[in-house]
Amino acid sequence: MAAAAQTGKKKTVRPGEWKIWLLYAVGFVPAVWTFYLGASGNLGADPVKTFEHTLGLWALRFLILTLMVTPIRDLTGMAFLRYRRALGLLAFYYALMHFATYMVLDQGLNISAIVTDIVRRPFITIGMISLVLLVPLALTSNNWSIRKLGRRWNSLHKLVYVAIAGGAIHFIMSVKSWPAEPVIYAGIVSALLLWRLVRPHARNRKPVSRPRGEAMAVKK
């Protein structure tokens, strides 16, 4: 009887769930590899800044990939909705590591200096706001929160648009000149946000069924 009860309580594994865990594993490779390069003295003259920059860049990249899921589905019919939650959470983890690197390795946990930077340096202020906005999205990226919040969950997760815009602005303002890289990322982010604005008016297709439980992105 006990064995039967335990069997009945086993969690059902969804088909293809291993692909999501593989995405998480692959997603952390850049962080691990860059850390290894820094630890082995192969990140140039300023390894801390390079490590910090790389983590922030990957946070922005994963946010971009998160928002690309819907346009890809609209334009090609290819549905990657099951991976959207993982992509969004990877973006949050990288943003958190980016800030942790700044706090610990860059500022040496000097709270006074950190607070001063956040208050007085606009690009850090914007970056901090973007990180704070990602926190409730990460905390509610689960099926329980979707059921509990209902329609409010959709409204909450629209904050991802503000967060990614802030991330792009943070990137541009963090460089002293205007190299192509941050401008390109800002252009991609702008295109994705524009798509979200015009999509309700331009869409003229058969509705596509949407699986429940995909977080860190917004349903329209």
Swiss-Prot record:
Under Gene Ontology molecular function, one entry of this record is:
FMN binding
Q: Which Pfam families match?
A: Ferric_reduct
Key word Transmembrane helix present: yes
The places in or outside the cell where this protein is found are: Cell inner membrane
Annotated GO biological process: protein repair
On cofactor binding, the record's note says:
Binds 1 FMN per subunit.
The topology of this chain with respect to the membrane is: Multi-pass membrane protein
Query: Signal sequence: where?
Result: none
Q: Name one GO cellular component term.
A: plasma membrane
User: What is the protein's quaternary organization?
Assistant: Heterodimer of a catalytic subunit (MsrP) and a heme-binding subunit (MsrQ).
Family designation:
Belongs to the MsrQ family.
* Role description: Part of the MsrPQ system that repairs oxidized periplasmic proteins containing methionine sulfoxide residues (Met-O), using respiratory chain electrons. Thus protects these proteins from oxidative-stress damage caused by reactive species of oxygen and chlorine generated by the host defense mechanisms. MsrPQ is essential for the maintenance of envelope integrity under bleach stress, rescuing a wide series of structurally unrelated periplasmic proteins from methionine oxidation.
Official protein name in the record: Protein-methionine-sulfoxide reductase heme-binding subunit MsrQ
Q: Which organism is it from?
A: Brucella anthropi (strain ATCC 49188 / DSM 6882 / CCUG 24695 / JCM 21032 / LMG 3331 / NBRC 15819 / NCTC 12168 / Alc 37) (Ochrobactrum anthropi)
- Give the gene that encodes this protein: msrQ
